[in-house]
């Protein structure tokens, strides 16, 4: 595992990402690269029944509570994968393009936002491990002034690109906390909107955006829906 996997702005713990991404110096949309050894381990993890159930529970929760936004994620990822068959989803039928495993042994995040994710999009956070959630490991949403007990096995969806979040420390060195984080980089949607090319290539070819930034944001917020719409869609 490289130095960047254990020293990063989100916390003092090992973390490894897998999936489809664009940004951070990439020239085009692609699969995150790993050594053959790490790739084999990640493949085994992603193919395990337990991990597939955990990941797809988060995906199905996303579909249930944010159906329009989920469709946008899923349709964009489908378009990317159809255009480039080399792209590989982490989990079949899952709308999230990428996942990060926070490996701990005490994965306690610093205050941060995931500013490269889709601004109005959702990030699924699932806590794992063995710790007392009444005494530590809480999820803190700073902008909402909320401290949430977050036991192992809990999943939450938050707009992590714009909402500052972190974790409370664990109280015992014998406790362990890990996490599965699922998300999609904003650059993927920008790439698709630019006709599956970079913004620079799009503009050089005389491309004109169908919407202004303000219009795009309004459209994005409209995908979140409201409580009355959620109730009306359920029996």
Pin down the residues of each PLM region.
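Anionic coordination/interaction segments
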Residues: 1-127, 131-141, 145, 151, ...
């Amino acid at each position: 595992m490289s130095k960047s996997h254990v020293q990063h702005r989100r916390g003092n713990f090992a973390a490894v990402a897998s999936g489809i991404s664009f940004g951070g110096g990439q020239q085009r949309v692609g699969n995150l690269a790993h050594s053959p050894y790490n790739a084999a381990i990640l493949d085994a993890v992603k193919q395990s029944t337990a991990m597939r159930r955990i990941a797809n529970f988060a995906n199905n929760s996303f579909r249930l509570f944010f159906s329009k936004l989920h469709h946008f994620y899923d349709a964009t990822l489908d378009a990317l994968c159809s255009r480039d068959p080399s792209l590989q989803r982490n989990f079949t039928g899952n709308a999230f393009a990428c996942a990060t495993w926070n490996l701990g042994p005490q994965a306690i995040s610093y205050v941060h936002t995931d500013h490269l994710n889709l601004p109005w999009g959702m990030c699924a956070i699932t806590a794992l491990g063995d710790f007392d959630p009444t005494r530590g490991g809480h999820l803190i949403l700073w902008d909402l002034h909320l401290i949430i007990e977050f036991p192992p096995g809990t999943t939450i969806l938050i707009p992590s690109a714009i909402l500052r979040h972190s974790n409370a420390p664990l109280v015992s060195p014998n406790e362990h906390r890990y996490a599965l984080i699922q998300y999609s980089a904003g650059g993927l949607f920008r790439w698709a909107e630019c006709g599956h090319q970079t913004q620079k290539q799009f503009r050089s070819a005389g491309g004109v955006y169908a919407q202004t930034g303000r219009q795009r944001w309004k459209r994005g917020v409209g995908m979140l829906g409201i409580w009355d719409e959620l109730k009306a869609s359920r029996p």
